[in-house]
Amino acid sequence: MKFIKIFITLALIAGLANACAPAITPVAQTPLPSATKQVAATKTPTPAASRLEVEVEALRGKQVNVWHPWFGAEANLFESQIKEFNAANEWGIVINAESKGNYSEILLQTSAALTDSSAPQIVIALPEHALAWGDDVLDLNPYMHDPEFGMNALDMSDFVSVVWRQDEVDGKRFGAPAQRTARFMLYNRTWARQLGFDAPPQTLAEFEAQVCAAHVALMNDSDPNNNSLGGWLIDANAYTALSWMFAFGGGAQVEDGYRFLSPGNVAAFKYLKALQQKSCAWVAAPNLSVGERFAARQALFVTAGLGEFSDVARAFVAANSADEWIALPFSGEERDEIVVYGSSFIAFQSDAETQLASWLFIRWTLSPENQAEWVKSAGLLPLRNSTLDLLAEYSTDHPQWAQAVTYLSNGEATPQLSSWRLVRVVLEDGFRDMFDVIRHPDLTEGQAPVILTQMDEAADELNK
């Protein structure tokens, strides 16, 4: 029971302090978009009447306040796009943006503002935050499907499947995607070839063979200080844990709750702990970054988020390393997986005119042209298939990003429960605890189920 209470306490603290903020799924492609952005509403020869019962004239001068978590380059891009929308949109809608600096502040300040009617009309927040705000959130489905102001079927099918379905729960669309990312296995292909491996591992046995070979190579070199290194650099991030669990046929969500104690999750935990016990996976001290360790050949495999790829690339340059590294999904025996996660545009209930104005801005930001600018700025996943048509040069200049994008068809969504913002911390703590060599020097047959059971009990408490 003490262990469960620690889980819950850490989850509650971290849920407030660390609300973190991602081949394409084959679908019919839309015609190549124009190079010129279109701010005006799409025209058709015989436009159908809107079902929203809003006079277009009533939109003129309508003010929409938006809170976002970004700073630096992302904030500058967002505010630049807002300036463009304000200057060119045919309805005379005015968007006002305010940065809150991070997702924790978005959650805290929005939750407080909803109690005293001072909330903005739109926030960029995590999908699980929208679920926590419940009935205050505007269902975007009537707007998306409106004959005059919505999206057509080709536009909607252009969105990557795992991205598009992430914001819809029980028939209500709580948001529209803003950014998506994922974590990947990074693999030093040059070093692997020198170890005798011509291709990345395709099975769990091949993964073990390669990480253990890297460890043996460092054991046998002239430097005694690296004898415990060489395989997979263990990463306890919740999305890394969830990716491994999916790869083994497990997961986190079952209906309206969680189930960590499952055969797939047990198998994942036991397999990874066994690698650590063989010294083929290891936990690093925080004195060097993941990229620095990877570039220095301290690990054949590391795990990183898509937004960290540029840092890894810079680490190789700083180390004067010409090694080739590539991005891979998390591989199990029967499936390769990544977990796609990130932020969404969330609109709130207000008057009919403001709601429509909010939607028209959201729709505009989701154009392929605008999304291409976001990819170039943040280096995250494209939300739409057609966005890739505008990113040929970016793909050439960022080959690891281009590789990562091909795995979007392997994407799994995060749990669609408001408690996920807290239960995510439980998963991370449980996964990290398993690799604690003092608490768990050897993972006996029954220890993995015990850890997962404790995680289930903590998750059940947080999901009430």
Model-derived regions: residue spans:
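Short, solvent-exposed loop/beta-turn-alpha elements that line the ligand-binding surface or hinge
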Residues: 141-159, 222-232, 250-268, 315-320, ...
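Glycine-centered hinge/linker elements that transmit conformational signals in sensory
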Residues: 210-215, 255-284, 330
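Hinge/lid segment of periplasmic solute-binding proteins
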Residues: 47-58, 127-184, 223-224, 322-329, ...
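Long, aromatic- and glycine/proline-rich binding clefts that accommodate carbohydrate-like moieties
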Residues: 49, 325-328, 376-429, 433
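Extracytoplasmic/periplasmic solute-binding protein
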Residues: 169-178, 183, 205-258, 299
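Conserved C-terminal helix/tail region of periplasmic/extracytoplasmic solute-binding proteins
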Residues: 35, 41, 193, 409-464
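Extracytoplasmic "Venus flytrap"/periplasmic binding protein-like
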Residues: 84, 88-158, 193-202, 298-301, ...
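Extracytoplasmic/periplasmic substrate-recognition and gating elements
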Residues: 193-195, 266, 274-281, 316-383, ...
